[in-house]
Swiss-Prot record:
It comes from Strongylocentrotus purpuratus. One of its GO terms (biological process) is regulation of transcription by RNA polymerase II. GO terms for molecular function: DNA binding; nuclear receptor activity; RNA polymerase II cis-regulatory region sequence-specific DNA binding; zinc ion binding. This is Orphan steroid hormone receptor 2. Binds DNA as a monomer. One of its GO terms (cellular component) is apical part of cell. Residues 248-563 form the NR LBD domain. The gene is SHR2. It comes from the Eukaryota. Its main location: cytoplasm. Residues 84-159 bind DNA. Belongs to the nuclear hormone receptor family. NR2 subfamily.
């Protein structure tokens, strides 16, 4: 600014003076009273006129308490220096309030990725790592924990801003098929919290209703479920003491589903062969790193590779009695077993659940537990002598028809270990909220609610009956050898095996529970309930987070061809060795 000297009549003039405001040096305009004969240094006349005009319009105001102590007083609408805000998570310079907390761009992006991709992390320390700017990437588990503790909300992660490729794959909805149940253990409260869903109004990004014929997902992605969970144990479940790899069997199921999809898409897709590591990378969508547990995953995929490479020739050596039946012969000699339908080792059904339960239990934990139960049920069925005398095609048909019934019996047997009641209660709460917010149609909610009620009623009844391991084994055998499913070959042989199982169960009840005369009939009367449960809804509740719209019965042939030794080895390795979550 040009400076001039003035010796005119007294006027109001201004000058620039540096003062301290909030520990910062700021240049301010100071009003100076002049008098005749006094020479002062002032700003140019044009600037002074503009300042006087602003003052007259009451836009600026100055006070002078002496030349050395002048201070500026601005109106509320005026811009004033702002203190620098720090990220509540790592202490870096904050860029604003994101998802409910003052945070930097780094923590904002980290939280968004973690919620959108449903990533789970593990802490290599004591879950109390210090999170600062320079080491915030060292422990993602503690960083995510601190994000939540500082007030970041997962339901604020907007679905409509998700990557374009994700939106293209799931038109009209954010969820591929089912809500990502993301369970959080509230470490601040010593009490068990009621399982509740945080509604996904922000996540939905539109109406969740879909036309009939499309399998509509039940929930939105990234929804948090507040649950204080304590480790549970059950006689029917074996729980490991170390953090197991939650990706192994779930990844196998996903890989089978993806492989089946590629086969259906055409030769150009199905002819491409992926190694186990490449397959895992495809499952992870190229952006989820597997930290540790590589040996466990490789062993599981080795078993998968053997199953996929098994040719029809390997099945020719099976003791099959179906070929003659399919050849048109109406008189087929039935096979008689020299031993009972079940032996002592068939009574054992030990499900190894992922343990310990992490503080942040995402959908992979639930799907992994369900995958293990599915594998265990199928390989248990394969071990039955009566099952082994049938052909491979009959194996596939039988299991495809009744996999949901076998799975439900397994859920009832391992309900405590899987915390089934907690999961179902949370889903019911969310369905009620979705109905109130018009996110799901009333018919859709009614169908799922009825399914859950039937499932819970079945589990509760078996619990009240105190069904033991042997009784569960015989009930599964009776369900497996059901001759009334359409499309089965050699129905007479299957019916014969079912009659043997019923007879052996009757003898067991008479010997073990002689005073409970109605126990045998009560057990058999529970089986019709299994036919009322929808396999499609069962897939959606427990598997859709893994395989989307692929049906379980499409991957059953691959699972049945897996070698039992490989499956058992993968299970043992996962139980004995610590692993990590996909994240």
């Amino acid at each position: 600014m040009g400076m001039v000297s003035s010796q005119a009549t007294p006027v109001e003039a201004y000058k620039v003076q540096q003062v301290q405001i909030n520990d910062q040096t700021v240049e301010q305009l100071v009003r100076v009273q002049t008098s005749a004969g006094t020479t002062v240094t002032t700003i140019d006349a044009a600037t002074a006129e503009r300042l006087v005009k602003l003052r007259e319009e009451d836009l600026i105001k100055f006070s002078a308490q002496g030349m050395s102590q002048a201070q500026m007083m601005a109106k509320p609408g005026m811009t004033s220096p702002r203190p620098i805000e720090l990220c509540a998570v790592c202490g870096d310079k904050a860029s604003g309030r994101h998802y409910g907390a003052i945070s930097c761009e780094g923590c904002k992006g980290f939280f968004k990725r973690s919620i959108r991709k449903h990533l789970g992390y593990t802490c290599r320390g004591n879950k109390d790592c210090q999170i600062i700017k320079h080491n915030r990437n060292r422990c993602q588990y503690c960083r995510l924990q601190k994000c939540l503790d500082m007030g970041m909300k997962s339901d604020s992660v907007q679905c409509e801003r998700s990557p374009l490729k994700t939106r293209d794959k799931t038109p009209g909805n954010c969820a591929a098929s089912t809500d990502k149940i993301y369970i959080r253990k509230d470490i601040r409260s010593p009490l068990t919290a009621t399982p509740t869903f945080v509604t996904g109004s922000v996540l939905a990004g539109g109406d969740m209703k879909s036309p009939q014929g499309n399998r509509q997902g039940l929930f939105d992605q990234g929804i948090l479920l507040n649950v204080q969970t304590t480790p549970t144990s059950s006689p029917s479940a074996s729980t490991s003491d170390s953090t197991t790899d939650l990706s192994t069997l779930a990844s196998v199921v996903t890989s089978l589903a993806n492989m089946n999809k590629k086969t259906e898409e055409g030769p150009s897709h199905s002819q491409q062969i992926y190694s186990p590591s490449q397959t895992l990378q495809i499952i992870s969508n190229g952006d989820q790193d597997v930290q540790g547990g590589g040996d466990n995953v490789s062993k599981a995929f080795d078993a998968l590779t053997k199953a996929l490479n098994t040719s029809g020739d390997s099945e020719a050596g099976d003791l099959s009695i179906d070929q003659s039946a399919n050849g048109g012969s109406s008189e087929v000699e039935l096979v008689k077993l020299d031993s009972p339908m079940l032996s002592d080792h068939h009574m054992q059904f030990k499900l190894t659940t992922p343990s310990p339960m992490p503080q942040f239990l995402n959908v992979h934990y639930i799907c992994e537990s369900a995958s293990r139960l599915l594998f265990l049920s199928m390989h248990w069925a394969r071990s039955l002598p009566a099952f082994q005398v049938l052909s491979a095609d009959t194996h596939t048909s039988m299991v495809q028809k009744c996999w949901s019934e076998l799975f439900t019996l397994g859920l009832a047997q391992c309900a405590q270990a899987m915390a089934l009641s907690t999961i179902l209660t949370a889903i019911v709460n969310h369905l009620q909220t979705s109905l109130q917010q018009d996110k799901l149609s009333a018919d859709r909610v009614k169908a799922v609610m009825e399914h859950i009620w039937k499932l819970q009623e079945f589990v509760t009844t078996t619990s009240k009956l105190d069904v033991d391991q042997t009784e569960f084994a015989y009930l599964k055998t009776i369900v497996l050898f059901s001759p009334d499913h359409p499309g089965l070959s050699n129905v007479r042989q299957i019916e014969k095996f079912q009659e043997m199982a019923i007879s052996e169960l009757h003898d067991y009840e008479a010997q073990t529970y002689p005073s409970k005369l109605n126990r045998f009939s009560k057990l058999l009367l529970r089986l019709p309930t299994l036919r009322l449960l929808s396999p499609a809804i069962m897939e959606e509740l427990f598997f859709a987070g893994l395989i989307g719209n692929v049906q379980i019965d499409s991957i059953i042939p691959y699972i049945l061809r897996m070698e039992t030794a490989d499956y058992n080895s993968a299970q043992i390795t996962m139980s004995a060795s610590p692993g990590s979550l996909i994240g």
